[in-house]
């Protein structure tokens, strides 16, 4: 495994490449709201060691990517983040497999309906408008005129860090960043529309038993929506990527990819 971070038009990308080249499609990982590529590092290491070429991008205004002007950022839709995905995919030059988490799962769906992808993996993902949207009561109303700041730690722990120990939860909470209020509304209030007939690739959906943000029942609906294979993870919450036992999720994804003959 080799690590090689780079930038594409202000988009910071973490690249983990395998020791030996293969003909497999690259894996492009898309993080969720308020997060960054750091959230994928366990998976980047796991899959690159298994022979996959892995890229984890950062949306604009997230982690080490460049920041857009305030007015532009607060009005950004999740659909707009397909811009970052497209630029990274173009720089790779190969049709990828897209793996998205949470709000990044909606970004992945938006991208897949406008650009060709080999496969789509949706991990505790935001669901399309066609399936309704779980209304999450936040501690304070969303102010559309300013960036949305991560909620207080105890509330964030209930949403993001179920089944995560206190020390790890605080470490990850410290890495959270501001989000576009428009994107947050799309995720927890009214959703974005998806034309599933425009997504012509195999889809895997992963849901978690304890997830309050993207409830497991919603993940089952999402799998049915796409006629996709569904993986149910017991004893875990919304954050499946860094919690103890994350390997179970990575292995399920890898096994599914092999079933698709990748």
Set out the residue ranges of the language-model regions.
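Conserved loop-alpha-helix segment in the C-terminal half of the alpha/beta-hydrolase fold
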Residues: 207-236
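Short beta-strand/loop motif that positions the catalytic acidic residue
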Residues: 199, 205-207
């Amino acid at each position: 495994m080799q690590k090689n971070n780079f930038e594409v038009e202000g988009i910071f990308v973490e690249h983990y490449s395998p020791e030996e080249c293969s003909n497999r499609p690259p894996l492009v990982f898309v993080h969720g709201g308020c997060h960054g590529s750091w959230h994928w590092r366990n998976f980047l290491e796991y899959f690159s060691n298994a022979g996959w070429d892995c890229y984890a991008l950062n949306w604009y205004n997230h982690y080490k990517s460049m920041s857009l002007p305030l007015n532009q950022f607060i009005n950004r839709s999740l659909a707009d983040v397909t811009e970052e995905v497209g630029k990274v995919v173009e720089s790779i030059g190969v049709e990828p497999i897209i793996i998205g988490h949470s709000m990044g799962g909606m970004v992945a769906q938006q991208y897949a309906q406008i650009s060709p992808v080999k496969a789509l993996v949706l991990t505790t993902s935001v669901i399309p408008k066609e399936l309704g949207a779980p209304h999450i009561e936040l501690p304070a109303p969303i102010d559309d005129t300013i960036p949305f700041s991560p909620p207080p730690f105890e509330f964030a722990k209930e949403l993001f860090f179920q089944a995560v120990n206190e020390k790890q939860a605080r470490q990850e909470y410290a890495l959270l960043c501001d989000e576009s209020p428009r994107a947050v509304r799309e995720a927890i209030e009214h959703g974005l529309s998806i034309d599933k007939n425009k997504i012509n690739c195999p889809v895997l959906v992963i849901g978690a038993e304890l997830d309050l943000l993207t409830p497991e029942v919603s993940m089952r609906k999402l799998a049915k929506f796409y006629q996709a294979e569904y993986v149910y993870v017991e004893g875990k919450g919304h954050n499946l990527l860094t919690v103890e036992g994350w390997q179970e999720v990575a292995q399920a994804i890898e096994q599914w990819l092999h079933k698709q003959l990748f």
